[in-house]
């Protein structure tokens, strides 16, 4: 499994640290240089981590792409990226709904929203996901508990409560 992370802020860094401590069978973790401090720190933790300056390089080398960008930056960045049909996109961006993400990440069809918390680094994060996806749920279960929202409206309410 090759994971890609666009954006390396607090949440993304916590998720990666948690996954590295877990028993996840990850072949490679491709990350962006967006936060130079965090990306360098992560690279030192594992030889599985590769740092790229271009988001497209991360997308081209990953089967599951996690989007951990600020809302204002996410739309702009995703518009210029080219995704593949079989890729799974997991968005940590609160303001982008599934419909918008499907448009921005086309032709990728599998889009999941996820709201992990910084405790993911210690495998203590309650993570909200929508819609349910077996593989993504199992990844987040490695870094804490998972709550699957019934629909996007419930997902949005749960996100507000977790922030």
Q: Where are the language model's segments positioned?
A:
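Glycine-rich phosphate/pyrophosphate-binding loop and the adjoining helix
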Residues: 161-163
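A structural micro-motif
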Residues: 1, 27, 49-50, 87-88, ...
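Solvent-exposed, charged/polar functional surfaces in cytosolic regulatory/catalytic domains
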Residues: 18, 41, 76, 80, ...
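Internal alpha-helical scaffold of NAD(P)-dependent oxidoreductase catalytic cores
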Residues: 100-110, 125-159
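Short alpha-helical
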Residues: 10, 37-38, 72-73, 96, ...
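Predominant activation on well-ordered alpha-helical scaffold segments within soluble catalytic domains
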Residues: 16-17, 75, 102, 137
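NAD(P)+-binding Rossmann beta1-loop-alpha1 motif at the extreme N-terminus of oxidoreductases
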Residues: 1-53, 57, 61, 124
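Rossmann-like NAD(P)(H) cofactor-binding subdomain of soluble oxidoreductases
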Residues: 38, 46, 54-129
